[in-house]
């Protein structure tokens, strides 16, 4: 993370932290139906989802569908954190605002996004973060960035690792009139330990790597990437 403040977006972010997500329930129901019909969908380890406490949903990122598969599937309301560039698409902007998302400026310290995510977690909500910061081109894990660890330690939040498999196969399978197998494997929720002090950047990276290794343990070896 750099120390350069992120420029303010002209788009409203209020929906993510004040509870104004008018179509979240509708979108979740629609997404569940779509994936039930178009894929062979399975969630393993649903018992690991925290019942009431705020938590971070940590995902590996292998396809644009990843957040859409995860957010309706955990039995808890989850706030995604998409890149702010997604607002440039009118349709995606409609979804982001009405679902209730926290847009993030990538590459800089986005203090507003950090504050909104922290507030959401402290109020008992859940946010979805891909610590890799971008999609993996190979399907294997790439090095995690410390932004998730910064938010997790600031909010003292639980982290639920969710390993995604199969999303890149969805559209190719549909073209052949088949349904791809899509699997979410949930690990045990954990909390990052800073030893009671403020985490340095080196410690944040260490905590990030530890979290990514937990993610790797939920994936087949071929998808563990730099965390084999």
For each predicted feature, which ranges?
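Non-catalytic C-terminal accessory region of glycerolipid acyltransferases
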Residues: 2-23, 112-228
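Catalytic core of membrane glycerolipid acyltransferases/transacylases, capturing the structured
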Residues: 28-29, 36, 49-108, 116
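Short gly/ser/thr-rich secondary-structure transition/capping motifs
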Residues: 36-44, 165-168
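A conditional alpha-helix N-cap/helix-loop micro-motif detector
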Residues: 39, 107-110, 141
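Conserved beta-strand scaffold positions in the cores of enzyme catalytic domains, especially
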Residues: 43, 80, 101-103, 159-161, ...
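Generic beta-structure capping elements
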Residues: 46, 60, 83, 107, ...
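A short beta-turn/loop motif at secondary-structure boundaries
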Residues: 47-50, 176-177
């Amino acid at each position: 993370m750099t120390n350069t403040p992120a420029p303010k977006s002209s788009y409203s972010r209020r929906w993510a932290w004040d509870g104004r997500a008018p179509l979240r329930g509708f979108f979740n129901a629609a997404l569940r139906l779509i994936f039930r019909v178009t894929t062979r969908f399975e969630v393993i380890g649903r018992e690991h989802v925290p019942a009431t406490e705020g938590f971070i949903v940590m995902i590996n990122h292998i396809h644009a569908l990843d957040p859409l598969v995860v957010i309706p599937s955990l039995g808890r309301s989850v706030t995604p954190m998409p890149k702010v560039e997604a607002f440039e698409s009118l349709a995606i902007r409609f979804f982001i605002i009405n679902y209730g998302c926290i847009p993030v400026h990538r590459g800089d310290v986005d203090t507003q996004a950090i504050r909104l995510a922290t507030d959401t977690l402290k109020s008992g909500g859940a946010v979805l973060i891909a610590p890799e910061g971008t999609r993996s081109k190979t399907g294997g894990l790439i090095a995690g960035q410390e932004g998730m660890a910064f938010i997790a330690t600031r909010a003292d939040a639980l982290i639920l690792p969710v390993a995604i498999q199969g999303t890149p196969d969805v559209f190719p399978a549909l073209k052949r009139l088949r349904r791809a197998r899509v699997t979410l494997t949930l690990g045990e929720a954990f909390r990052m330990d800073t030893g009671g002090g403020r985490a340095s950047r080196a410690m944040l990276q260490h905590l990030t790597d530890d979290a990514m290794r937990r993610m790797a343990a939920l994936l087949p070896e071929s998808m563990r990437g730099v965390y084999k």
